[in-house]
Amino acid sequence: MEITASLVKELRERTGAGMMECKKALVENAGDIDAAAEWLRKSGLAKADKKADRVAAEGRIATAQAGGKAVLVEVNSETDFVAKDENFLAFTEVVANAALNSDAADAEALKSVKLDSGETIEERRAAVIAKVGENLQVRRLVRIDSANNVAAYVHGGRIGVLVELKGGDIELARGIAMHIAAMNPPHVKASDVPAEFVAKEKEIELAKMSEKDKAKPADILEKIISGKISKIVNEVTLYGQPYVLNTDQTVEQAVKAAGAEVIRFQRLAVGEGIEKVVEDYAAEVMKQAGLA
């Protein structure tokens, strides 16, 4: 069968592969475009495997929501350049929507979720890797499913927050989500702060005190330490922080004024916890030359 330019063009549009690769695939498969597409996909999967050990620390947080059901997914790429690529961005939306419509509890379970095309998320990931030329990872999935107010907020594709608010309204829930994105509190309220953390902070504050202060009566000393610990606890709790949308009140005051309660929240930031590889090309060359 003759390999025409229009056939090559059609295969390129279907697969996103290069012109020469498409032509070769058609030649190898006697002009059968379906077989050629499969051949390219297999080739793409092989390329994907070779990229699997690269560090993927850039990427995007995507969200999907339907009423009180909402998800956040973190999809990583190796570079910020690919994180802005339309193929990558489209993939993150596919992943978020698939997560919302599935009962997958985490990113590992999400891999086997099937799309309308019949592909799994993992198969689609490999196909996108072949297009963009970088390792991609579906790293994290968090979800909230509740009859309460649920807000999903993503800031710049880099930080995502889900908040469940009992009482109040969705606008307040969204405002709190924005606050969490900006201030990153580890806990909701003081009772959520681990006792070990409080004990350690007391130790530190006591060690920082002057001998003169340490010589004060025990009840006075306890008040001083308690005041310092209270300030620290406020800093690490959502309720204790000044509300970013109205710094004249704390988040707790804003929530209670609406007769509401924050039940829980989830916050993801791109690449947190991933050790980025810093390339030192000079050192690498010296090592290869036996000079280091």
Swiss-Prot record:
Belongs to the EF-Ts family. Associates with the EF-Tu.GDP complex and induces the exchange of GDP to GTP. It remains bound to the aminoacyl-tRNA.EF-Tu.GTP complex up to the GTP hydrolysis stage on the ribosome. It comes from Xanthomonas oryzae pv. oryzae (strain KACC10331 / KXO85). GO terms for molecular function: translation elongation factor activity. This is Elongation factor Ts. Residues 79-82 are annotated as: Involved in Mg(2+) ion dislocation from EF-Tu. The keyword Protein biosynthesis applies. SUPFAM superfamilies: Elongation factor Ts (EF-Ts), dimerisation domain, UBA-like. Pfam families: EF_TS. Keywords: Cytoplasm, Elongation factor, Protein biosynthesis. It is found in: Cytoplasm. One of its GO terms (cellular component) is cytoplasm. The keyword Protein biosynthesis applies. PANTHER family: ELONGATION FACTOR TS, ELONGATION FACTOR TS, MITOCHONDRIAL.
